[in-house]
């Protein structure tokens, strides 16, 4: 394992340095080979670096800027007018080879726009995709993409997403021949719109992707597949609905376990199991969405992430950098194109 550097937008998200800096300190304690460049207002950042050990501080660099991309900034406005923002500088550090990955909890649209313009897409990739991990009943991760970077997609784009998702599962989780499916309104080949049907036909012709066919919404968490592909409109609604249901179940479970004397006693007895169950359903446990298909690594954290959730996103960015995810995707695409043309 070699040293790596993470560029971190310290000002992004709902809480800025109050969350990003303490989470960074935790990550540095966990990984002695990690260095972090914190981009943002040095005065605010320094306030949260006070408890850091000298050895930890030596692995932190600060790029000072007071400009921030706000949550209300439109992507085009951010591109044109936020050229000294903490988000943009963090991405530029990846572009210039000074960092191997970038992480931000800021404005998603601005992050995607800046990343695509500054880092460019990989050869053979038309559009980057936003992908995140979901829980499954067998405790294996399931990747869902796209989550909103591309509201509408043609069949070729869905095909590219399937290839990238397959490589992601192999690279990050070491899954052997990940099972890939297209999210659809039915499993029959005649179901779905033209784009989904045509994407399925393309994938059937590519042996390098273990395409299993269509999958319906009620099978997303079954663990029967490793990668689920859809356009960003469907994916974003699916993700947000999942997070809402998880919070509802958590609320109802906590409420139910406080009603009645004997129930409260039982709850204390099985508290460790309840805690484990709630943790599995907690969306923060899966924090960190990757913008894949770019020539560099960009990870988006939830804006409302707490310290533990932001640490999860840091760990994801580090893992993708260590395993050279963009290069792995590029190599796989090159192999597929060679087979198609041979």
From Swiss-Prot:
Keyword Disulfide bond attributed: no
Location(s) in or outside the cell: Cytoplasm
UniProtKB keywords: Cytoplasm, Lipid biosynthesis, Lipid metabolism, Phospholipid biosynthesis, Phospholipid metabolism, Transferase
Taxonomy, superkingdom: Bacteria
Catalytic function, reaction form: a fatty acyl-[ACP] + phosphate = an acyl phosphate + holo-[ACP]
GO molecular function: phosphate:acyl-[acyl carrier protein] acyltransferase activity
Annotated Gene Ontology cellular component terms: cytoplasm
Pathway(s) per entry: Lipid metabolism; phospholipid metabolism
GO biological process: fatty acid biosynthetic process; phospholipid biosynthetic process
EC number: 2.3.1.274
Keyword presence, Cytoplasm: yes
Family to which the UniProt record says this protein belongs: Belongs to the PlsX family.
Assembly and interaction partners: Homodimer. Probably interacts with PlsY.
Function: Catalyzes the reversible formation of acyl-phosphate (acyl-PO(4)) from acyl-[acyl-carrier-protein] (acyl-ACP). This enzyme utilizes acyl-ACP as fatty acyl donor, but not acyl-CoA.
Name of protein: Phosphate acyltransferase
């Amino acid at each position: 394992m070699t040293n790596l550097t993470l560029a971190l937008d310290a000002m992004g998200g709902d809480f800025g340095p109050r969350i990003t800096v303490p989470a960074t300190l935790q990550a540095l304690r966990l990984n002695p080979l990690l260095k972090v460049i914190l981009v943002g207002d040095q005065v605010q950042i320094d306030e949260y670096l006070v408890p850091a050990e000298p050895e930890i501080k030596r692995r932190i660099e600060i790029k000072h800027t007071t400009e921030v991309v706000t949550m209300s900034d439109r992507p085009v406005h951010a591109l044109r007018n936020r050229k000294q923002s903490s988000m943009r500088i963090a991405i530029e550090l990846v572009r210039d080879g000074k960092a191997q990955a970038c992480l931000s909890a800021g404005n998603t649209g601005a992050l995607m726009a800046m990343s695509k313009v500054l880092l460019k897409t990989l050869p053979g990739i038309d559009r980057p995709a936003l992908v995140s991990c979901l829980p499954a009943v067998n405790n294996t991760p399931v990747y869902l993409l796209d989550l909103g970077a591309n509201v509408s997609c043609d069949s070729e784009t869905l095909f590219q997403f399937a290839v990238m998702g397959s490589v992601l599962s192999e690279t990050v989780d070491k899954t052997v021949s990940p099972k890939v499916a297209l999210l659809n309104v039915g499993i029959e080949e005649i179901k779905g719109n033209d784009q989904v049907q045509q994407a399925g036909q393309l994938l059937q012709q590519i042996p390098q992707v273990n395409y299993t066919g269509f999958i319906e919404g009620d099978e997303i968490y079954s663990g029967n597949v490793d990668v689920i592909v859809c356009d960003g409109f469907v994916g974003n609604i699916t993700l947000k609905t999942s997070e809402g249901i998880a919070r509802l179940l958590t609320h109802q479970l906590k409420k139910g376990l406080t009603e009645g004397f004997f129930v409260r006693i039982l709850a204390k007895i099985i508290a460790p199991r309840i805690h484990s169950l709630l943790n599995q359903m907690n969306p923060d446990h899966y924090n960190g969405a990757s913008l894949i298909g770019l020539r560099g690594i960009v990870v988006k954290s939830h804006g409302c992430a707490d310290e533990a959730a932001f640490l999860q996103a840091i760990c994801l960015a580090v893992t993708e950098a260590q395993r050279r995810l963009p290069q792995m995707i590029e190599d796989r695409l090159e192999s597929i194109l060679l087979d198609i043309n041979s």
